[in-house]
From Swiss-Prot:
TM stretches of this protein: 5-25, 334-354, 357-377, 431-451, 476-496, 522-542
Family from the record: Belongs to the OXA1/ALB3/YidC family. Type 1 subfamily.
GO BP field: protein insertion into membrane; protein transport
Localization of this protein: Cell inner membrane
Assigned keywords, A-Z: Cell inner membrane, Cell membrane, Chaperone, Membrane, Protein transport, Transmembrane, Transmembrane helix, Transport
Predominant location category: membrane
Membrane-protein topology: Multi-pass membrane protein
InterPro entries according to UniProt: Membr_insert_YidC (IPR019998), Membr_insert_YidC_N (IPR028053), YidC/ALB3/OXA1/COX18 (IPR001708), YidC/Oxa/ALB_C (IPR028055), YidC_ALB_C (IPR047196), YidC_periplasmic_sf (IPR038221)
Source species: Rickettsia rickettsii (strain Sheila Smith)
GO cellular component terms attached to this protein's record: plasma membrane
Annotated protein name in UniProt: Membrane protein insertase YidC
Function: Required for the insertion and/or proper folding and/or complex formation of integral membrane proteins into the membrane. Involved in integration of membrane proteins that insert both dependently and independently of the Sec translocase complex, as well as at least some lipoproteins. Aids folding of multispanning membrane proteins.
Source organism phylogeny: Bacteria, Pseudomonadati, Pseudomonadota, Alphaproteobacteria, Rickettsiales
Keyword Transmembrane helix: yes
HAMAP family attached to this UniProt entry: YidC_type1 (MF_01810)
């Protein structure tokens, strides 16, 4: 086989291996600070006890008791649910715009659930103190509210007064999307100084996540000291805890493929933050939390602090908006755009732009593919000419190989001299393929991780561009009443991709090496089985790209 082709195939395989394996096998070095503020250090042990008490419901509590607690109803265009007035916990949240699946009666996606339910998942913000004598609101406190409904048009005002006359006020607002703003105010009407710390936490009962493809992060995540921190559930389980002392915390949270819950603390100070794992009574729990330095509130003085909770769908434009509006560093990285971020995000923007005009992401993929093809036309033309020259030079190359078969150095020297004389670049034919690799993976990432592509239909039987083609040739595309095993789910679009790939090969210059020609003949069949389980949107892109390549090849053949 021609050495250049062998090297090309090896390079492509190596590239695929690196791209898929990088995020799974490479552990990013995490730098830890060694110093911590003295006030925070003194409060650390008590803080642990208080936060622990907050996240562990007492044994014996049942769901019926939880339902008896008064709640504030959440009602907006994007959300429905409620906030518990006991402990001021965000533990009941449903995303109104998203269904769990494509079935007719599918329920809406539930994000938060109370602590004593099967899929416990909730968020809190509050106050703790390094003095046990200070009476602060805790997880048993029943707050008073001026309203029963929280909506974008109507904030909710809460209050509670301790036995010393210290007043605690909380104002909660929600926007039309997924962002809650919580402002806590302490009015110290006592004759004592009050040392307090603000905290926030997100606690979740572990649910097994999708592990079919190791190019997607799910689990604890955050931006600390302007660096993205990502830990898988297994990472935190092994370490039990990952701590960051006195750091700039832009946001921390827990991310799924499409959903995010995140704490966004006030920017007025640094915070200690933790990613934790605990196993209690056979239940695995994960928690992310932050706590501020000690703030001393003098008698007769007030203190206010504002924090935010994001809980909802990871829409690209929405995260971009919040990142800019509230200066939340790297908030868009909650969407795992991956290694080719600088390409993947522009590809998404292009698709989303055309979607605004055509109203179908499948059609948008077709348009973006045409644009990419036009941008690469000159490169493809040069590549084709180089391949033709290489084929014409093959007899001369074979003659040189026979002549200098015992002298490798002279052989390479003579071949390079021939290339120079004929003005041929031996790798020029590889460039279009190599350039398309990042484009291919960028489109794959867009289809796989963006909420905009979730359950986005095309035409005909394609109801979800982010899922594999649901048909298979082995039951005649649904005409026969049985479901083949998953490895035989080879649908119409994978078959179309393989056919167009075969036709494209027929249009291209035939390899001079017989062995190489045989290998290339089997490539469509190999790719048919390899990519049948990939998102159908990717196969639409590839099939359309092949069709455009055939048209392009016809044009080049005719006019060159």
């Amino acid at each position: 086989m021609n050495n250049n082709i062998i090297n090309l195939i090896a390079a492509i395989i190596l590239s695929l291996s690196i791209i898929f394996g990088w995020q799974y096998f490479v552990v990013k070095p995490e730098q830890k600070k060694q110093q911590q503020q003295i006030a925070v250090q003194k409060a650390e042990n008590l803080k642990k006890q208080q936060l622990k008490a907050l996240v562990e419901p007492a044994t014996g509590i049942v769901v019926q008791e939880e339902s008896q607690v008064q709640r504030i109803k959440i009602e907006s265009e994007s959300l429905t649910g409620s906030i518990s007035l006991k402990g001021l916990r965000f533990d009941d949240l449903i995303l109104k715009k998203y269904k769990q699946d494509l079935s007719k009666n599918s329920p809406e996606v539930r994000l938060f659930s109370p602590a004593n339910t099967e899929n416990a998942y909730f968020a809190e913000v509050g106050l703790v103190s390094n003095l046990s004598s200070v009476k602060l609101p805790n997880n048993d406190t029943i707050w008073n509210s001026d309203s029963e409904i929280l909506s974008p048009e109507k904030p909710v005002h809460l209050f509670w007064v301790n036995e010393d006359g210290v007043k605690f006020l909380v104002t909660i607002t929600v926007d039309e999307n997924y962002l809650f703003t919580i402002e806590q105010t302490i009015v110290n009407n006592s004759d004592k100084e009050l040392p307090v710390q603000s905290y926030g936490l997100i606690n979740r009962k572990y649910i097994a996540v999708e592990k079919a493809v190791n190019i997607l992060h799910q689990g604890p995540i955050g931006c600390i000291d302007e660096n993205l921190k990502e830990y898988s559930y297994d990472d935190i389980k092994d370490k039990k805890s990952e701590k960051f002392a006195a750091s700039k915390v832009d946001w921390i949270g827990i991310t799924d493929k499409y959903w995010l819950s995140s704490l966004i603390p006030d920017k007025s100070s640094n915070y200690s933050s933790n990613f934790n794992y605990a196993l209690k009574q056979g239940i695995e729990r994960y928690q992310v939390d932050f706590i501020s330095p000690v703030q001393i509130i003098k008698p007769g003085k007030n203190f206010s602090i504002k924090s935010r909770i994001f809980a909802g769908a990871k829409k690209v434009d929405l995260l971009d908006k919040y990142e800019k509006q509230y200066d939340i560093k790297l908030f868009d990285r909650a969407i795992d755009f991956g290694w080719f971020y600088i390409i993947t995000k522009p590809v998404f923007y292009a698709m989303n732009f055309f979607y605004g005009y055509v109203g179908n992401f499948g059609v948008s993929i077709l348009i973006v593919t045409v644009i990419i093809k036009l941008l690469m036309f000159t490169l493809a033309n040069k590549s084709y000419r180089s391949m033709k020259k290489m084929k014409n030079l093959q007899p001369e190359i074979d003659r040189i190989k026979n002549l200098y078969s015992d002298d490798k150095a002279r052989l390479n020297q003579e071949i390079m001299a021939l290339y120079k004389k004929e003005k041929v670049n031996p790798v020029a034919g590889c460039l279009p393929i190599l350039v398309q690799i990042p484009v291919f993976f960028s489109i794959y990432k867009v289809l796989y991780v963006t909420i905009e592509m979730r359950q986005a239909p095309f035409y005909g039987w394609i109801k979800d561009l982010s899922a594999p083609d649901p048909t298979t040739i082995f039951n005649l595309f649904g005409l026969l009443p049985f479901a083949p095993p998953s490895f035989l789910m080879i649908g119409a679009w994978p078959i179309l991709m393989a056919i167009t790939m075969f036709l494209q090969q027929k249009m291209s210059p035939e390899p001079a090496d017989p062995m190489q020609a045989q290998v290339m003949k089997f490539m469509p069949l190999i790719f048919l089985f390899m990519f049948s389980s990939f998102p159908v949107g990717l196969l639409i892109y590839w099939s359309w790209n092949n069709i455009l390549s055939i048209i392009q090849q016809y044009y080049i053949n005719k006019f060159n």
